[in-house]
Amino acid sequence: MNTFLLDYHAILTPKKGFPALFKDYTSEGEARNRLISGCFHLDYLNESDYYRQLRQLESRPFDRELLATILRRQNTRYGCTELHLREIEKLRSPRCMTIVTGQQPGLFTGPLYTIYKALTAVVFAERQKTLFPEYDFVPLFWLEGEDHDYEESAHTAVFSAGGIMHFRPEPFRRMPDQMVAATCFGEDIRRIVADFLDQLQETGNKPLIASMLGDCCFPGNTLEMSFAQLMMHLFKNQPIVLLSSQDPDFKKLSRPVFLRELSTCPASSYNIIAQSSTLENLGYSAQSKPRAVNLFHINHHGQRQKIEYPEDNRFVITPDNIHLSRHQILELCQDHPERFSPNVALRPIVQDTLLPSFACIAGPGEISYLAQFRRNYEQFGLTMPFVIPRGSFTLVEPKFSRFMDKMLRISGKSGFSRKQIYHAFFSDLQTLKRNAERVGENPELDSLFFSIRDRIEKALKDLGPVLAKIDPTLEPMLAASTLQAMKTVDTIEQKARKAGRRKNEELIEQILKTETAFFPEGVPQERLINVFYYLNKYGMELIDTLKNLLAGHSTEAHLIVEL
């Protein structure tokens, strides 16, 4: 299995590639140094920060017993193994830290990067255990089931004969803005599962996949529960623990953070605006727009409702138009913390207040978000955890590996490597396409066939006087032969040019197919395609293979894997 590392700065396809902030964060140099010092607390390249973070977390109070109890109950429901329960038990010790990642639940686990996040958390935790054997590090996946964007969450896609096939089941009696965790599958989930399986090749792995999907995706089950159950199936041999934040007991743990946000708002908003200004002064764009109150209210239908702050000490829950004083909303939160949900700005604060978060595994967009939250962490008396880039892959199937071999031969450049071909594909695909369009063209053909016709005509013309002396009646035959010779040359030229065009068209078609495989619908493969497409073709052990590859490489570069 060949692997190639590509620097994120070199990836400009599709569109503009990765965000500038992320590219600087994963590189070295003055731009990175300014970014770290201005927007983060810890630098994962600085060894002394690791010891500082360990000491700081070890001395902080956490309700580890309740946390372990919640996790044990939740993960048992998800179908965990003894391996996962042993990981949970470690959290009762003050010398145990979490490596946190997370994602909103996706249909059939959603896009590939969800799997890559979980694998990166496992690998990073194991690496820290090797470096600091006196501590334990538990990889933890935060289920963002409180997200209310069902259309985005309940979606997945795979490659099909006609291009890309999308799947999105209809929910059962879903209310507007209802949390994903409270949204159940309707009857059509059975059809969606069947249609999804129809798009997978017949392999020895397909019956197992069909069984997994059938067991986890059925009418009445929630998207969050099915996601968690599938993740447990896929990671049964990996020590990752799942956490659902909408658990009522976990909400009780979250209550102090909610109360502080409500009692001090709009302070969080001002902090994020000030930090965003720092970010923009460094040359980056702010990704998150804070609200005056960075909490939602959850009604009895499981709908997330905005909490507005139109004037001092007055709150309005919309769209129900419920007016509350600060005292009233604080009292509501004190009695019913399960009715509140953090937004994107407050969620990391909740996470790192309640969990001994040594590090969080984040994608390119998430790192850009987190860069806006440093001052808000300080507002809540917290140190940001290490922010580790998640693993990023492009999986290359054998037919596309063979095409890369062909591109290497066509390039005609001695010493040109496979990595350079991939570099060209990811850095400047349009130029590669333009060059391919000229492959079938041969500018030498024009001059070559002109020369051949000229030589034939001259040779036969020189033969004319000789034939006339021998027998004048041979001259018409010579003229006919000259015409026939020219027609033969014309036929050869036409066939040569047709073959060139065919070669050109085949090459362009192969480039377009490869582009679809690497950048389906113009986005990176990892952001759209479902993992079961690859597990079906290459085996369930692909999860372990990718984990081992991550263990041997840095996540500061994109990893191309030839399957």
Swiss-Prot record:
Domain of life, per lineage: Bacteria
Q: Does the keyword Ligase apply?
A: yes
Q: Which UniProt keywords apply?
A: Ligase
Q: Determine if Ligase is one of this entry's keywords.
A: yes
Coiled-coil stretches noted in the UniProt entry, renumbered to this chain: none
* InterPro entries assigned to the protein according to its UniProt record, in alphabetical order: Bacillithiol_biosynth_BshC, CC_BshC, Rossmann-like_BshC
E.C. number: 6.-.-.-
Q: Which GO terms describe its molecular function?
A: ligase activity
Q: Which Pfam families match?
A: CC_BshC (PF24850), Rossmann-like_BshC (PF10079)
Q: Which family does it belong to?
A: Belongs to the BshC family.
| Protein name, as recorded | Putative cysteine ligase BshC
